[in-house]
Design a protein with these regions (language model features):
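Hydrophobic N-terminal alpha-helices or hydrophobic patches in metabolic proteins across all domains
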Residues: 1-132
Length: 132
């Protein structure tokens, strides 16, 4: 489905330290700012019971804004044992630098999510698996 347009609701604007759930509730505070806009695709469902996630590259977008963006790639991610892939969206095809930044972000994000899941008593592996 890369190259197709998706509607994404922004839950975490670029530069934000606050990760929110699809309903807007605060999920956690990050020690580092999110380097990308991060949101969800309404009307979809991932294995974790939440809507599919999407990263939107580019300028900072307002919290709660709805944007139509082009899918450029997809990363494979496991969160507390549940398959939780993420769409990567941008106006133009991804450069090598952008791909490395996204991969690096999800490697670090997986470490943080492992800690959060352990504190919350969630079982199962949490890890970044690479590009789909």
């Amino acid at each position: 489905m890369t190259g197709e347009d998706l509607t994404v609701v922004i839950d975490v604007p670029r530069g934000s330290f606050i990760k929110r759930d699809d309903d807007g509730a605060v999920d956690f505070f990050s020690p580092i700012p999110c380097p990308f806009n991060y949101g969800h695709v309404p009307g979809t469902l991932a294995d974790d019971g939440d809507a599919l996630d999407a990263v939107v590259l580019g300028a900072k977008l307002p919290l709660g804004s709805t944007v139509t963006v082009t899918t450029r790639a997809r990363v494979d991610f496991i969160d507390a044992g549940c398959h939780d892939p993420k769409w990567v969206c941008a106006d133009t095809p991804l450069s090598g630098v952008q791909r490395r930044r996204v991969a690096g972000f999800f490697r670090v994000y997986a470490l943080g999510k492992r800690f959060i899941n352990a504190v919350r008593g969630k079982k199962g592996s949490t890890r970044y698996l690479g590009w789909l």
